[in-house]
């Protein structure tokens, strides 16, 4: 998901990135 491409987003929502 596009969140995973954004470092701060991936840190806030770690479960979204495989």
Curated annotation (Swiss-Prot):
Tissues where the protein occurs: Expressed by the venom duct.
Disulfide bonds, paired cysteine numbers: 3-9, 4-17
UniProt keyword annotation of Mitochondrion present: no
Places the protein is found: Secreted
GO CC field: extracellular region
Principal location listed in the UniProt entry: secreted
A molecular function GO annotation: toxin activity
Tree of life domain: Eukaryota
Keywords from the named record: Disulfide bond, Secreted, Toxin
This protein's domain notes: The cysteine framework is I (CC-C-C). Alpha4/7 pattern.
Name listed for the protein in its UniProt record: Conotoxin pc1A
Organism, scientific name: Conus pictus (Cone snail)
């Amino acid at each position: 998901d596009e969140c995973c491409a954004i470092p701060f987003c991936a840190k806030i929502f770690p479960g979204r990135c495989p």
